[in-house]
């Protein structure tokens, strides 16, 4: 039997309350949702704040407003933020240092590649997109912050080239300790749909073939879809992987809470025969510094 499964709850992202009223935005809401997710079985919570483009210290403090109440009750809780959407990689990651220096964050993030993101217009053609760009130098900066502050990188894999970049760092012995790669499959709804592979067994096989021989833990997520209903969560659990859920990614037929989405994966893990990792167990699985 495979070991404990790490469940990450991505609790808000750019999902609006109009789209789902259960989406937390303010720090007090973020704290409440995070506590509920940890109680339900999540080991990691990822969230955005309600402002972009702040200076690093201000952005860090806004995150900590939501994290401190949780860590008072759950000192084992694992959090990590998103980028700060600055004009360059230094500004976009300027909050990582202050968050690490607070002593309240053990994870960071890395997006090791570039990808077109956008939805489909009425004619079915891609429109209103952006190029989310991360050069190899940007990736080096992101990993450098992890090394400097002793943070485990949570690594987004939007396309196969992202994984090849990570593997180059791993083969060179330079991948920071505590890393996890997350295979982001593209769903069929929302601004983050339409990129990369769809959530199928064949697509996961392709990623796992690239990863063959590498011992870095991996997880699956479906952005603009439903990781549970798509079936890819079960396949991942059966193959020893981990799962990310949450209202940042969800675009199913209902308006669930983050807690309910975590419960779905917990039930699936029980059905597959895998225990659910606590935050402390997740830290050991990842080998966090």
Residues covered by each model-derived region:
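Catalytic alpha/beta core domains of metabolic enzymes, predominantly
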Residues: 107-247, 254
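Glycine-rich, proline-tolerant flexible connector loops at the mouths of alpha/beta enzymes
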Residues: 43-66, 184-189, 250-253
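N-terminal small/glycine-rich loop or linker at the start of catalytic domains
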Residues: 1-22, 112-126
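Active-site beta->alpha loop and helix N-cap motifs at the rims of alpha/beta catalytic domains
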Residues: 28, 57-133
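Structured C-terminal cap/extension of enzyme domains
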Residues: 164-165, 231-289
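Conserved, mostly hydrophobic/aromatic
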Residues: 30, 37, 48, 108, ...
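Alpha-helix-loop-beta-strand connector modules within alpha/beta enzyme cores
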Residues: 56-83, 139-142, 146, 204-215, ...
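Active-site mouth loops of central-metabolism enzymes
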Residues: 13-32, 83-91, 128-133, 195, ...
């Amino acid at each position: 039997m495979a070991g404990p499964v790490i469940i990450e709850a991505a609790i808000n992202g750019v999902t609006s309350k109009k789209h789902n009223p259960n989406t937390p935005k303010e720090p007090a809401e973020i704290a409440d949702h995070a506590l509920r997710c940890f109680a339900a079985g999540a080991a990691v919570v990822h969230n955005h704040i309600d402002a972009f483009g702040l200076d690093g210290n201000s952005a860090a403090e806004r995150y900590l407003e939501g994290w401190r109440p949780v860590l008072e009750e759950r000192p084992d809780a694992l959090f990590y933020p998103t980028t700060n959407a600055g004009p360059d990689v230094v500004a976009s990651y300027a909050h990582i240092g202050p968050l690490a220096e607070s002593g309240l964050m053990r994870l960071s993030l890395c997006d090791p590649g570039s990808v077109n993101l956008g939805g489909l217009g009425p004619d079915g053609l891609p429109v209103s997109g952006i190029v989310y760009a991360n050069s190899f130098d940007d990736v080096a900066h992101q990993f450098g912050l992890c090394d400097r502050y002793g943070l485990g990188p949570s690594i987004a894999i939007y396309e196969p080239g992202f994984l090849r970049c990570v593997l180059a760092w791993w083969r060179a012995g330079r991948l920071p300790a505590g890393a996890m790669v997350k295979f982001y499959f593209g769903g069929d709804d929302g601004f983050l749909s339409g990129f990369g592979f769809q959530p199928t067994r064949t697509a996961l096989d392709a990623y796992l073939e690239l990863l063959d021989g590498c011992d870095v833990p991996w997880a699956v997520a479906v952005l603009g879809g439903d990781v549970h209903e798509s079936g890819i969560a079960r396949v991942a659990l059966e193959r020893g992987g981990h799962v990310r859920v949450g209202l940042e990614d969800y675009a199913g037929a209902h308006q669930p809470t983050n807690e309910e989405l975590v419960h779905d994966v917990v039930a699936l893990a029980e059905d597959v025969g895998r225990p659910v990792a606590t935050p402390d167990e997740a830290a050991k699985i990842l080998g966090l510094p």
